Amino acid sequence: RTGFGTFGGSLKDLSATDLGVFSSTAAIEAAGITPDQVDHTFFGNALQTSADAIYLARHIALRSGIPDEKPALTINRLCGSGFEAVVQGAKEIILGEADVALTGGTESMSQAPHVVRGARWGGLRLGPASGQFEDLLWGALTDTNCGLSMAQTAEELAERYGVTRSEVDEVAFHSQQRAKTAWDDGRFDIEVTGVGLRTRKGETTYRADEHIRPDTTVEGLSALRPYFKDDGLVTAGNASGMGDGSATAI
């Protein structure tokens, strides 16, 4: 996998496809196979932010050296898209349709665009925009069928199942500490591949999980205000972060 960049962080200028190529080429090398041995590519991508998102799995496969006659499929099962890619790859092998499958998931939330609905059909005129200006990222995080965002859903579930703010903050705290320990102990060395970046200072290699805050404390978390409800439990400290990254398994 790549390291995971925070929202608007070090990986913001790389598309989800770009990130998928980094993890896929590294996985092929780690597995000790050649690209032409891959029979099928399955890649999960929930928020289709790259310009070539419609071709994502295909482009990752081609750019990873997999021959163009080998099929590829992009999967959207929301947060489970990468897991579903692994499931589909395993099914192909079980059914005898493939011996080797390249599977994974990739997202670039930082590259989610703003769009103007109706602009194609004359929705834009001189002066104030008459089209509907829309944040594709914020829209994706809200289920219009029920009118709830992910965080609001968390608040509903917490109330239903009696989850407390202190319990949620404890989980967030231990998550941060475990992530730091894993990095300090070298547990991620075998799985995290470097991502080459061009900066104003020249070429550099990114290899980190940018969203980790090892100085997080329970006291600091408990001092944060709830974001969606005055008496709620979802805060900037215990909610899942938005970010960019990719992971691949052969």
Feature locations, PLM:
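Conserved active-site "lid/cap" helical segment
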Residues: 1-46, 50-64, 71, 153-165, ...
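Beta-strand segments within the central parallel beta-sheet cores of soluble alpha/beta enzyme folds
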Residues: 36-44, 71-76, 101-105, 167-174, ...
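Active-site-proximal alpha-helical scaffold in enzymes
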Residues: 76-107, 152, 158-187, 248-250
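Conserved catalytic cysteine-centered active-site region
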Residues: 11-14, 41, 45-100, 133, ...
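Flexible glycine-/small-residue-enriched beta->alpha junction loops
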Residues: 100-156
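Structured loop/turn residues at beta-strand edges in well-structured enzyme cores
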Residues: 33-36, 68, 96, 190
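Short glycine/serine/threonine-rich phosphate/pyrophosphate-binding segments
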Residues: 4-6, 53, 83-87, 109-112
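N-terminal extracellular/periplasmic Venus flytrap/periplasmic-binding protein-like
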Residues: 1-2, 12-25, 30, 167-250
